[in-house]
């Protein structure tokens, strides 16, 4: 039996003050890309969400190099997700002594990086190969349908 080697590290950013919808717009562009390509994309995109995501990707790469000793060239973003956080509620004073509620959304961003140079070992003794029983093919016969002889659409008077 062989042990499974850990090849994934993650970085988690919680309570980031921006909408989850705006952060997902950036996350969808970097999912599945390499580390160096991701940094270039995040530096050149004109969105406000890029900076906290850039910091998380950089932190996940630092976790990978410190915990696993992996090289940054071999890192790929295997999973990136954005979840909605709590909504911070504030009051804005308005005219004639009134106040309006302001809702400031937050989000939680998770970046999971995988080292593609490390192989995962699988125990081959526990895998059993089984064949599915072959099913008999059903033969269908086609019959000619005559719509004029049994009261079709033109038989009405």
UniProtKB/Swiss-Prot annotation:
Q: How does it assemble?
A: Part of the 50S ribosomal subunit.
Keywords in UniProt for this one? Answer: Chloroplast, Plastid, Ribonucleoprotein, Ribosomal protein, RNA-binding, rRNA-binding
Would you name any one GO CC term?
A: large ribosomal subunit
One Pfam family from the UniProt entry?
Ribosomal_L22
Coiled-coil ranges per the record? none
The GO molecular function terms of this record are:
rRNA binding; structural constituent of ribosome
* Compartmental location: Plastid, Chloroplast
Please verify whether the record's keywords include Chloroplast. yes
In the UniProt record, does the keyword Chaperone occur?
Answer: no
Entry-linked InterPro entries: Ribosomal_uL22, Ribosomal_uL22_bac/chlpt-type, Ribosomal_uL22_bac/org-type, Ribosomal_uL22_CS, Ribosomal_uL22_sf
Q: Which NCBIfam families match?
A: rplV_bact (TIGR01044)
PANTHER family per record: CHLOROPLAST 50S RIBOSOMAL PROTEIN L22-RELATED (PTHR13501), LARGE RIBOSOMAL SUBUNIT PROTEIN UL22M (PTHR13501:SF10)
Instruction: Give a short account of what the protein does.
Output: This protein binds specifically to 23S rRNA.
Q: Which family is annotated?
A: Belongs to the universal ribosomal protein uL22 family.
GO terms for biological process?
translation
List, alphabetically, the Gene3D superfamilies matched: Ribosomal protein L22/L17
Question: What is the protein's given name?
Answer: Large ribosomal subunit protein uL22c
């Amino acid at each position: 039996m062989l042990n499974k080697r850990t090849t994934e590290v993650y970085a988690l950013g919680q309570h980031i003050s921006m909408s989850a919808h705006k952060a997902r717009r950036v996350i969808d562009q970097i999912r599945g890309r390499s580390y160096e390509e991701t940094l270039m994309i995040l530096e050149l995109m004109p969105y406000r969400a890029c900076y906290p995501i850039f910091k998380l990707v950089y932190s996940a790469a630092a976790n990978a190099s410190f915990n696993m000793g992996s090289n940054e060239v071999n890192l790929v973003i295997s999973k990136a997700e954005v979840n909605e956080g709590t909504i911070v509620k504030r009051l804005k004073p308005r005219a004639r002594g009134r106040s309006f509620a302001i809702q400031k959304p937050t989000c939680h961003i998770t970046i999971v990086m995988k080292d593609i140079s490390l192989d995962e070992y699988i125990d081959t003794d526990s895998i059993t190969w089984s064949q599915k029983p072959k099913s008999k093919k059903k033969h269908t016969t086609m019959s000619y349908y005559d719509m004029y002889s049994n009261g079709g659409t033109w038989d009405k008077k």
